[in-house]
From Swiss-Prot:
<keyword id="KW-0276">Fatty acid metabolism</keyword>
<dbReference type="InterPro" id="IPR036736">
    <property type="entry name" value="ACP-like_sf"/>
</dbReference>
<comment type="similarity">
    <text>Belongs to the acyl carrier protein (ACP) family.</text>
</comment>
<dbReference type="GO" id="GO:0005829">
    <property type="term" value="C:cytosol"/>
</dbReference>
<feature type="domain" description="Carrier">
    <location>
        <begin position="2"/>
        <end position="77"/>
    </location>
</feature>
<keyword id="KW-0963">Cytoplasm</keyword>
<feature type="modified residue" description="O-(pantetheine 4'-phosphoryl)serine">
    <location>
        <position position="37"/>
    </location>
</feature>
<keyword id="KW-0444">Lipid biosynthesis</keyword>
<protein>
    <recommendedName>
        <fullName>Acyl carrier protein</fullName>
    </recommendedName>
</protein>
<dbReference type="GO" id="GO:0000036">
    <property type="term" value="F:acyl carrier activity"/>
</dbReference>
<dbReference type="InterPro" id="IPR006162">
    <property type="entry name" value="Ppantetheine_attach_site"/>
</dbReference>
<dbReference type="GO" id="GO:0000035">
    <property type="term" value="F:acyl binding"/>
</dbReference>
<comment type="pathway">
    <text>Lipid metabolism; fatty acid biosynthesis.</text>
</comment>
<keyword id="KW-0275">Fatty acid biosynthesis</keyword>
<keyword id="KW-0443">Lipid metabolism</keyword>
<dbReference type="InterPro" id="IPR009081">
    <property type="entry name" value="PP-bd_ACP"/>
</dbReference>
<keyword id="KW-0596">Phosphopantetheine</keyword>
Length: 78
């Protein structure tokens, strides 16, 4: 089983169409990886599906970096 970090990075790479090695924890989805607002919504939906969790809109707005996504998932795993 892949770690949460590996799974998040894979989802980010797939959703944003970037190479997995470009996805590092400090990268911002918008500033560094070229995401737009639709990309970020789709990314949150993909994370919700992968980790079987619901991310409220007010929380989703705070998830702007790869590390923030990893931290959120780790904090909300059942």
């Amino acid at each position: 089983m892949s770690t949460i970090e590996e799974r998040v990075k894979k989802i980010v790479a797939e959703q944003l169409g970037v190479k997995e090695e470009e996805v590092t924890v400090e990268k911002s989805f918008v500033d560094d990886l070229g995401a737009d607002s639709l990309d970020t919504v789709e990314l949150v939906m993909a994370l919700e599906e992968e980790f079987e969790t619901e991310i409220p809109d007010e929380e989703a707005e705070k998830i702007t970096t790869v590390q923030a996504a990893i931290d959120y998932v780790k904090a909300h795993q059942a």
